[in-house]
Amino acid sequence: LQSKSSLSDFENFIPANEDIQPNERVTDNVNSDLKRQMQMSLAAFSGGICSAADLFTRGYDTHNDHDSLHASLFSHLTDSIDFFWTSAETAGLADRITMLIGSDFGRTPNYNSDMGKDHWPIGSFIVMESSPSWGNRVVGATDEGHNAYAINPSTLLRDDDSGTNIYPAHFHKAF
């Protein structure tokens, strides 16, 4: 914030009520305001009162009926990400944003007896920017059992002898 007036000026960046994104029904048990969170984050970025935002969505803890639940959840997520980048471009912010997408845990590689997937310590993060020079790249790998291989933190290549596993804390520290 440049001054106290920056906060009062923020109201100029908040969308009109009729333009605020509504809640969306994603599954029988999940209503999402993710697009509204994105919209308000972009308003805060535009208003100069915010440089980072931590957004969330729910419903991914699928201990039963995993595939059918994840299909609608991921469809909503990708639609929301597209909404975010389109809105960021319109606001003139896209070239200054780095988006991290991740979870606090992954899902087991195999189904349980309820066709769900339980908690698993191996997951993934997605790092996105508008036009990165480093895009279309995967860092890290797992074996057929979905166990992480160690990587060299300098080269980002697999290194079984002296590498390390990548943890969410590595992403948070880097950004």
Positions of PLM-derived features:
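Ligand-binding pockets and gating/stacking loops
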Residues: 1-175
